[in-house]
Amino acid sequence: ATTEIYTLSLQRRSSDLVIQFEIPDEGFILLPSKLYLGVTEEYTETHNFVPFLEGKSSVGRLGIDIHSTAGKGDAGFCNTWTLEISVKQPVRIYSGMPIGQLIYFEISGEINNPYDKKKSAKYNKKTIYPVESMMYKNFK
């Protein structure tokens, strides 16, 4: 699994620098006070659903949070999910380790502006890698 970690303080008005690396077979120890970006192995399309991302309870009991604020997706989001991972204590993770689950809620009615059709959508580019914050695009 590919993971990223921010190397500088976060800047909302510019692209932030991250280090990208593969988790080795022996695992990787996540440390508190760092923000890690991970990515799901699964690609999803949510045309008629609103997806919610939740951590698995066994992972939460290790002190791992898999999302900071982006636990809800948009109808029309078609991509892998970037995970915003932080930990309460040092903990070793492994590639392919099940850490989260998606829950889908069916939409009744018409979707007027699906995410994959929005001109302002910043995270539409299909990828198998974590995607760093694009907050800076809000200030152009």
What spans do the regions from the language model cover?
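DUTPase catalytic domain/fold
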Residues: S15-K140
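Glycine-centered flexibility motif
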Residues: A1-T2, G63
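Short, small-residue-biased leader/transition segments that mark boundaries at the very start
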Residues: T2-S14
